[in-house]
A protein has these predicted regions:
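Membrane-proximal interfacial segments on either side of biological membranes
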Residues: 8-14, 31-181, 190-323, 327-329, ...
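Hydrophobic/aromatic interaction determinants used to assemble and anchor large protein complexes
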Residues: 21, 27-29
């Protein structure tokens, strides 16, 4: 560490001013923090402050520093859970009050955050900015050729992306609330845009999602259905949808998560609705349990596959309807084919 500082003592307050502070880590590769810092320490530690601004700081090193300076703070606990990597650039940092309190932090330009802890959402290869304090915060992010992690949310917890962008906001008072705006996700399966909100209303909370998708692969739809939709829906989609392209898909979902899928006595408590069109699809309407000698599932084992299908699909609560305007089965032209499952949960 290299620095040339100045110490001022005023009544019960000591002020350290350190211009051009330089600290090099002992890791491999070594990383260097360069910053301007100002530290104020009161005799009773009730008015301690730390202010720093610099051009580059490793997230891993920042977590270690926070752990050493304020190990009991909420920010240090969050860093321990997230195990972040990557670099902060053009950052500003402020810690106000006693080291035992919660810091007020403002960072900019976060190139990386790796998801390695089971159960903790995360992202690889992310760029963006973050500003936060104990009550509210905002993250604006974008990335290319990375991976997002949503443990427990989707059948496959890891979702790769070619491009990802959006803004997230949060507040903790009067209730924890998360808001996601202008989210865009593009990968080899899906192209989706949308907004989402989550509020801590007890239990699993209340959610609101509105989204649209264009030119997405029908056979990959099951990957993006929330696991709380039930194994019946996800398994059927995985086995029955064999190909084609989904177009003009729209998603509308709101209500208490614990009451999903909002049928029966809970019908008025929320809404889950997915609609759209599909083209040139292949459907195995009645997926078979029959297996080949190698253990592979026999496609079309109980009912002939319907191919070259154009039509519409609808998911409402736990009801599913697939309406094929045209299609072919065993070389027989079909018109007005409808597959409906009133209760996908069984």
């Amino acid at each position: 560490a290299l620095f040339d500082g100045k110490l001022d003592k005023k009544e019960n307050l000591s002020v350290f001013t350190i211009p051009q502070l330089s600290i090099q880590s002992s890791g491999n590769p070594a990383r260097t923090l360069k910053a301007d810092a100002r530290i104020s320490l009161s005799d009773d530690h009730t008015h301690d402050t730390v202010n720093a601004a610099g051009d580059s700081l490793g997230l891993k090193e920042a977590a270690a520093a926070l752990e050493g300076f304020a190990p009991k703070s909420d920010a240090a606990a969050l860093m321990r859970q997230m195990t972040p990597t990557g670099q902060l650039e053009n950052f500003r940092f402020a810690l106000l009050g006693s080291p035992k309190g919660t810091p007020d932090v403002s960072f900019r330009d976060i190139p990386d955050r790796d998801p390695e802890i089971p159960g903790m959402p995360g992202v690889r290869h992310l760029n963006g900015s973050i500003a936060a304090n104990p009550e509210t915060g905002m993250v604006k992010a974008w990335g290319e050729n990375g991976e997002a992690s949503f443990p427990g949310i989707f059948p496959d917890p890891r979702v790769p992306f070619r491009k990802l962008s959006g803004t997230a906001f949060w507040s903790v008072s009067p209730k924890l609330e998360l808001n996601f705006r202008d989210i865009e996700l593009h990968n080899q399966d899906i192209n989706i845009k949308g907004d989402a909100d989550w509020i801590d209303t007890g239990g699993s909370g209340t959610i609101r999602v509105t989204a649209t998708a264009a030119n997405s692969l029908v056979k990959s739809a099951y990957k993006y259905v929330p696991t709380l939709a039930g194994a019946g829906i996800i398994d059927w989609l995985h086995q029955a949808l064999l190909g084609g392209t989904a177009q003009n898909a729209a998603v509308e979902w709101y209500g208490p998560i614990d009451r999903f899928p909002y049928n029966g006595r809970d019908a008025k408590s929320g809404l889950f609705l997915v609609t759209g069109n599909f083209r040139n699809s292949s459907l195995d309407f009645l997926p078979s349990d029959k297996r080949t000698e190698t253990g592979a599932r026999v496609i079309g084992g109980d009912w002939p596959i319907v191919s070259r299908v154009n039509g519409q699909f609808l998911f409402e609560a736990d009801r599913m309807v697939i309406a094929g305007d045209t299609g072919i089965s065993d070389q027989v032209p079909l018109h007005g084919v409808i597959a409906e499952i009133p209760h996908m949960g069984g």
